[in-house]
């Protein structure tokens, strides 16, 4: 006969539930009588979540309603401010967005649990090339800047709405109605006022100098917008320039050629000089019919110079007196210039100088009155100024560069052409190679400001600590910040240019006037060319003696997002922002721009944030970085709806996505895939079942049933101390933002302590003792605190699961007074446990728990051996005998004597005695060393019957043990 009367126990916790009882019970009536006398778990909390139903019931209360409640009711003097690094308002969200936003939400919810009000206003970065490109493609015919801006704004607004809804699907709590977007007039005016402040401090300047230029974006880029390809292959050439009138020590040499190496042949039409190093030894070398000037040290490196004959030494101090010709530019002579940046480990020791195409070349040119020459257009094509128009229209990184080499070959200038693999800058948005091109651009001087910013970082906590060096490295490498962009979709730089001369007008008076006009008419009015909005309308009256036109350049998008600190209200005696949390790529981007704009604006070494948290990137299960080209990008929606789980029909909902995020060591790169999600799903299931066990066994209990700490059983006191220790550890981990370690501790605590130790040790009392007995209420007291502790610990990570548990508590619990665990806060969730544990000797009880664990481990070894030898089938068939000469150990064991059988999952434990007629069931473990002394442990066969009610082998011939007979007798009264 089969009988199963309970399904609410977690796996491994149903040893009381009778599956095959006919062998032991005389009748079905007996079975029913005994089963009905047990206090079995009862709960409506399901094993599997009803995702759709839970969303409908709980979602609003733990997101938008909760944020508004805390905003209105919690103390704003102790607020926690997290500034949202704005994602780009372009396209659908990917899993990296989920990682970022959910990490922020977990931290915000933890602060809320502590009773702090949270200020979190999500933001979006709305300007930039990708959106502008979409706007241009959407309308093939040529549009005005104003029309492009209108279309771009529509695209950005649409993306913001789509992304906002997806973030809300992730249960991210925030002030969504007050979100900031960098294209709003309010944000842009605040940004322009920061620009004005920097102008007042003489930090804004214009210069015609080489900048990184993206031909694919048709705009200048800042260092923060550049990525590097370590496998880029350039065409390198060894080539020659003929030296004029070469003589050394009165000896003349004819047809001497300077041997030069370059990886940018396309810059040869812009050559204005050659440079050499004053400390390098140079010589003249004859090879075949040519005489070359080059570094002595580098001759052996060149295969084509094998067998070359050294004719003479050429001291570096006389090289400056020489000139050379460029056969591509006849009838001109060019100088040799001394430079310390020339190296002696690669090339020839002589460097081709093009001040229009390299920063070092530019600086050398400034020292020697060489104006930068860069005959290129915005598309990276030669203009007619290059080689008398022979290269016009050709792309320098394509056919143009090839044609230059061809022309040089025709002039017998080329010695060798070869591919050269090296690190090369790319546009981080278009992923196309960049060039260095001299164009007039606007800059922020960082020579002093970066020192202030670096000093400000001294008071900032960096997570992980090694991220500090990365950020400092970027700051140290920025003498200025190129802030102008040649795009229509962006915040316009409020500069006017004199008509004809193009001399810029950028004064405090002019910029202030323009900003005031924009505040009234809107930023878009700058691009509106109507009769009532001509250029003259934007000119301050003091400057109307000349004719000016409005500039078309816009500000770098990093300047946009970098001024997002303007959305935060200052706080007394506190940093503006408690936390900024973004991906590791933001060391070169937002983290820098936020810090630099703020410290420059404040003119003091004070960072806007107190903590910077950097998370890594996401790879698939094979360790490949997720990218569209590889087809391995994960859509967060596929995690939420269960699509990514192989063979799993049941979606776990947003809690699965959130638990995966929490499980990641976010300070490093992390992995995601079906197998990983399946493991996370198992953890989530464990959290549900552990909570369900507590709920089921608290169905008949309320706070008035709580047992005073002094009356608790020994094992229950130990459990409370372990709970308190767990709370301390969890609190420390949340405070240090070690979220993945919170998950690890949760899983370990549920598995190693609650499920495998405590629950197993107390189930007999829960099910078989009298319902209102102190022994049973003692367990329930611990379960009550365990459940509230679990709710407290998991709420920031899986708020939906926590709310579902909260709503499943009996009506007499806290949920009748507080809508969510966050409303209750940790004061009501866990403080009462601390007051109980304060009455106990924590250190002493922790030590005693460790001794019990040592004993349990040794006994489990004996039980395992007995099972493997087939001497017993079930550990309840065994008795344990512990012998010792240590009075400390004996005293300790007697204090826990009533709990030991249940802790060890055996029917009886004897201390320093062996009843008659017991047979040894396993090999004895001699001299087990414990903290209280040495013990000998033996395992014996039980000599009593299996109790038909509790299954312990402690029964008489009538089928019930003494305890169960007593309980049944009292239940009949």
Swiss-Prot record:
Major location category of this protein: cytoplasm
Gene3D superfamilies hit by this protein: 1.10.730.20, HUPs, Valyl/Leucyl/Isoleucyl-tRNA synthetase, editing domain
Compartment(s): Cytoplasm; Mitochondrion matrix
Enzyme nomenclature, EC number: 6.1.1.5
Alphabetically ordered keywords of this record: Aminoacyl-tRNA synthetase, ATP-binding, Cytoplasm, Ligase, Mitochondrion, Nucleotide-binding, Protein biosynthesis
Record field: catalytic activity: tRNA(Ile) + L-isoleucine + ATP = L-isoleucyl-tRNA(Ile) + AMP + diphosphate
Residues holding ATP: 628
Superkingdom of origin: Eukaryota
A biological-process GO annotation: mitochondrial translation
Pfam families recorded: Anticodon_1, tRNA-synt_1
Keyword Nucleotide-binding carried by entry: yes
Top-tier EC class: ligase
Protein name (database record): Isoleucine--tRNA ligase, mitochondrial
Species for this entry: Schizosaccharomyces pombe (strain 972 / ATCC 24843)
